[in-house]
Amino acid sequence: MSKDEYLITDAPLKALTVFAMPMILGSFFQQVYNMADSIIVGQFVGSSALAAVGACAALTNVFICVALGAGVGAGVLVSRYFGAKEYGKMKTIVSTSLISFLLLSILLGIFGFCFSHAMMSGLQTPADILEEAVLYLRVYFVGFPFLFMYNILSTMFTSIGESKIPLVLLIFSSILNIVMDLWMVAGLGLGVFGAAFATLIAQGISAVFSLLIFFNRMRRYQSPFQRFDGRGLRSMLRIAVPSVLQQSTVSIGMMIVQAVVNPFGTQALAGYAATMRVENVFSLIFVSIGNAVSPYVSQNLGAGKTERIKKGYHAALVLDVCFAALAFLVIETLHTQISSLFLGKDGTALAYQVSEDYMRSLGYFFIFMGIKMATDGVLRGLGIMQPFLIANMVNLAIRLSVALICAPRFGIDFVWLAVPAGWLANFLVSYAALRKSWPGEKVESSRIFS
């Protein structure tokens, strides 16, 4: 038995823990990578520059979610064929996805660059930080194809049970990003532009290394394959499109929240931007667990070991409870210190109040996000996409309703309630669908993916 096949052989909790931990650590370094801009800009330039960088975060996350969702669409099929040892079909999906998504990333980068000003204006970005926010965003979109392809390749690695290589590459690129940030922002005084350009360089190097290592790994599987397969692309898109929408509900929700927060002023936005970075750190832990569940489910489905799927789901819930408790303890103990890390001495009392209120609210309710992501991960791994999509649209609708209706009338505190309310509603719908969809021990994987 190959060591790459531990997701279909080891005890479910052990297999998921071994598989998910590098992904969780990778998520941490991904956020270190992202937070470096905010921390260094906030400390060396000021809270207005921090607000400019933070104002871009919700929008850039939407584009990142397109990359993540596209990767999931390919990854579910790669996992299925890997579990079934159909390596020729696996490599066909890999080649088709890389060609298709490289073109998509270039088109999205051009679109984002051209419409940066319009998008930031549409989010009601305060006038005093608008131009810096647009500058940061345009540099970001120049490097977007690198970021997109890195995320696709990272998903490919995890689909074949390899989660350590993306972690090593993320650690390397995170360190490089911090060094470049310090040099360009603190050393050269390039401000917001320097922070964005440092990130672009780190993303580019990481993407190139990922591509070279992945191609080398594929040489292990000597099977003939097609460079491009239209049917394979359609199969990917049937999973990828709902996955993009699911991944995007988190970021679109953040954009909605930001649009509601923006009229409260620059200092309220600075406080929100500080906590949004913290939210991203913990959110990506639960996203990583959900993303680990999908290839686990898909590989076991492909291998015909459907009895392991429910056990894997329960193992994921155990991991979610543990990390939700950790998030609560960290936030309750260190919320003031965490806020000061971003806001520094330049932050006003309002900025600190907004940051700490939002952060503590999240700490109480992260468990809802955890169980939602695990349940969604199982549905995605089974290829059951319609209820998966409906559940995430319910999530977005709840966020819209609570944030847009309650916050302007009752105050900014109601913004924070919109997020966990959406998570809980999403879980309830997803779980109801999952209870009706557990595959029997003799279910064939082709029935699920057709």
Predicted segments, located by residue:
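Short runs within selected transmembrane alpha-helices of multi-pass transporters and secretion channels
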Residues: 71, 140-158, 166-174, 195-208, ...
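Residue-level signal for short hydrophobic patches within transmembrane helices
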Residues: 9, 13-32, 36, 59-66, ...
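Short alpha-helical transmembrane segments in multi-pass integral membrane proteins
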Residues: 1-20, 78-143, 187-241, 297-364, ...
